[in-house]
Structure formats: C-alpha cells, structure tokens
From Swiss-Prot:
Location, primary (coarse class): membrane
Documented EC number(s): 2.4.1.227
PANTHER family with a match to the protein in the record: GLYCOSYLTRANSFERASE (PTHR21015:SF22), UDP-N-ACETYLGLUCOSAMINE--N-ACETYLMURAMYL-(PENTAPEPTIDE) PYROPHOSPHORYL-UNDECAPRENOL N-ACETYLGLUCOSAMINE TRANSFERASE 1 (PTHR21015)
Residues where UDP-N-acetyl-alpha-D-glucosamine binds: T15, G16, G17, N126, R169, S197, Q298
Organism: Bradyrhizobium sp. (strain ORS 278)
Protein name: UDP-N-acetylglucosamine--N-acetylmuramyl-(pentapeptide) pyrophosphoryl-undecaprenol N-acetylglucosamine transferase
A GO-annotated cellular component: plasma membrane
Recorded catalytic activity of this chain's protein: di-trans,octa-cis-undecaprenyl diphospho-N-acetyl-alpha-D-muramoyl-L-alanyl-D-glutamyl-meso-2,6-diaminopimeloyl-D-alanyl-D-alanine + UDP-N-acetyl-alpha-D-glucosamine = di-trans,octa-cis-undecaprenyl diphospho-[N-acetyl-alpha-D-glucosaminyl-(1->4)]-N-acetyl-alpha-D-muramoyl-L-alanyl-D-glutamyl-meso-2,6-diaminopimeloyl-D-alanyl-D-alanine + UDP + H(+)
UniProt topology in membrane: Peripheral membrane protein
Localization (cell): Cell inner membrane
Gene3D superfamilies in UniProt: Glycogen Phosphorylase B
Primary role: Cell wall formation. Catalyzes the transfer of a GlcNAc subunit on undecaprenyl-pyrophosphoryl-MurNAc-pentapeptide (lipid intermediate I) to form undecaprenyl-pyrophosphoryl-MurNAc-(pentapeptide)GlcNAc (lipid intermediate II).
Enzyme category, top tier: transferase
Length: 367
C-alpha cells in the first residue's frame, strides 16, 4: 500500500465492544486501499488483532465516573488535554476522516477533528445512543447506527443517521458460516456462559446453582464452557466436579466466535457487540442485562433479540438459580424451539455492515 493513500482514523474506547467493530471496519478499509490508525486509550494496547502498536495513538482521556466537583474537574482537564494532543495528531497525520465507535476516549479525537476541519462521523452499536456518542452527535457530519429507529425521536439527528449494522470481525464471519444443529433429545447439550470482557460475578453466583437444580439426567448431557473470574474459579469448579459435569472454565475465551458457533445455547450479558454477534452467527441465548446503567442500554439491546423470539431476557433481580434451571430444562426438552430461536437470531443479524459503514466513511470524507 502506498503511503499517499487516504488515512482514516478509527477512534474507540479500549474495550472489546468498541474495538471489535473498529477492527472490522479497519479490515474493510484496508481492502479498499486506505490506510488506518487507531486512536484510543491505554487499555487497547493489551488487545491483539489488526492494530499493532505502531498503528495505535494513545491520547489522554477520562470516563465520567462521578458527579462530584473534583471528579468532574479532573475529567474536564484530562479531556481537554486529550483534545489538544489529538488536535496536534490531526495536524501531523492529516487524516481524510475520523470515525468514533463510542466510549469517552473518542471524545478528544472527534472534537479535535471538528476543530481541525476534518470530516467526522460516529457509529453506535447500542439500541440507545451511548453518552459519549450523544455528546458528539451534534459535532459530526454523519451518524451510523447498528439498529433502526435509534434516533427517530430526534429529528435534528435523524436526518444525518444511517442504519448499517455492526461491523463483524473476520472470525465472526467465519463462525456465521457454521449452521445451527439443534441437540438431539438424549444427546450432548452444549452450553456457553460468558460475562463480557471482564467476566461477570453474577454468572459464578447463579449458574452453578442452576446446574445443580437440573434433573440428574441432564448432568450427563451437559458440555459446559464458562467464563469465570480467577477469584471465583475454585468455588465454581467444586460444584461442577461434585456433579461430574463436563465443564471447561476459563477467565477469558480468546476463541469466542468459534465457541459461539459450537454451542447450542449461550447465557450472557447483553452488550451491543455480544447481541450483534449472537444475531450474526444465529445462536439462541438467555440474556441478563447489566443493571444500573443510566440509559439501560443492555436492557434495550437484549430486547432486540427477545422481541424477535431469539432470546430469553431476564433482568438481574429475577436471575435466580431456580429461574435459570427452569429455562434451561424447558429449552433442553424442546430442541425445535432452540432451532427456531437460532433461526430468528440469524434473521435479526446482518453480515454486510463493514461494507456499508466503509461506504458511509468514504462518502463523508468525499473520497
């Protein structure tokens, strides 16, 4: 690739939910002959993938974690410092466009793009626009959403909004090619339990008790893979060993796309990326939205699949071992229902989002 090719800066918060769509778009842009760089915070340096360290620019940023005057002043100072650093980055790199994928680390580069006169746009994968993207929405030329109707009630923003879907990494596209095969009535039942990039303690608290409450005939059928925090590993392992469950426990699954494709049922949080991947691959799920969020984005995300009869949504206050055991037992006894849920999930997904978003980036940049 020649160095004079247009450069697109991808700005993303340093977690998988923001980085993975950015990576997927980056792959598509490189295919089209563009150069790409990632602007993010220090957390992204630990993720492997498309972006090597020489393709990453780290700018100071801060997430709003508290409403106290001291915390807000610190956040404002760091975001201001980050915006100045990002502005200098714009002057040095001269990008053709900047696209943000959400998270407060995207605020400095997107504001700097506005100050430097660089065309910019944002992508939001949630059913409800995130706080950072909400703040930036008035400062960008275009908005891309994964889901339709996100900004229908905001005429000022709806006019510059395009629904494209969530860009999928190559590993997800490979997994999406694996057809869903429902479990046989007496055959293995493959169950995957995940809790986001940092794990979720509620899964360690609830799932083992639910497995214990299942009919003993189901214990021998289960092939369980569960993401478990290191500090919870011993107590969770003890339950499964006592029940003689075929269980694999890991703090983090590096091959999650393949695991999603290989399982009959997924129990998970409902981050935007997870929901989009479940839909793209077409797998039935039990979704437990993260409680306490200001905009209840995970509740809305889970609703996309539960309303389509592709998932069962359980709020955390109702997520008990008894309730989960009941849902697993019912699904295990109805393989045709699992197959229907998988088909409904696949119908809700889209695999061409990276191409559609790349088209929008090129249009916004005037390329």
């Amino acid at each position: 690739m020649i160095s004079s090719a247009p450069l697109i800066l991808l700005a993303a918060g340093g977690t998988g939910g923001h980085l993975f769509p950015a990576e997927a778009l980056g792959v598509e842009l490189i295919k089209r002959g563009y150069r790409v760089r990632l602007v993010t915070d220090a957390r992204a340096l630990k993720y492997s993938g498309l972006f090597t360290k020489d393709m990453i620019d780290v700018v100071p940023s801060e997430t709003v974690r508290s409403r106290s005057p001291v915390a807000l002043a610190r956040t404002a100072l760091l975001l201001g410092t980050g915006t100045l650093a990002a502005f200098n980055l714009m002057r040095r790199l001269k990008p053709a466009a900047v696209i943000g994928f959400g998270g407060y680390p995207t605020v400095p580069p997107l504001l700097a793009a506005r100050l430097a006169g660089v065309p910019s746009l944002i992508h939001d994968a949630n059913a409800v626009l995130g706080r950072a993207n909400r703040f930036l929405s008035a400062h960008v030329k275009a908005i891309a959403t994964s889901l339709p109707g996100v900004l229908d009630r905001d005429p000022a923003l709806a006019g510059k909004t395009t629904t494209v879907g969530t860009p999928m990494r190559p590993a997800i596209l490979e997994a999406a090619a694996v057809p869903y095969v429902a479990p046989e009535t007496a055959g293995p039942l493959r169950l995957l339990v995940v809790g986001g990039s940092q794990g979720a303690r509620v899964m360690s608290d609830i799932v083992p008790g639910a497995i214990e409450r299942l009919e003993p005939a189901l214990w021998s059928r289960l092939v369980l893979a569960q993401q478990v925090r290191q500090e919870d590993m011993a107590r969770v392992r003890a339950v499964y060993d006592r029940l003689k469950i075929n269980a694999e426990l890991q703090p983090f699954f590096t091959d999650l796309p393949a695991r999603l494709a290989a399982n009959h049922l997924v129990i998970s949080r409902s981050g935007a990326g997870t929901v989009a991947e479940l839909a793209a691959i077409g797998r039935p799920s039990i979704l437990v939205p993260l409680p306490g969020a200001i905009d209840q984005d995970q509740f809305a995300n889970a609703g996309v699949l539960s309303d389509a009869n592709a998932a069962i949504r359980i709020v955390q206050t109702a997520f008990t071992s008894d309730r989960l055991a009941s849902e697993i037992s019912s699904l295990a006894a109805e393989p045709t229902r699992l197959a229907a849920m998988a088909q409904a999930a696949r119908a809700a997904g889209r695999l061409d989002a990276a191409e559609r978003l790349a088209d929008l980036v090129a249009k916004t940049a005037g390329l």
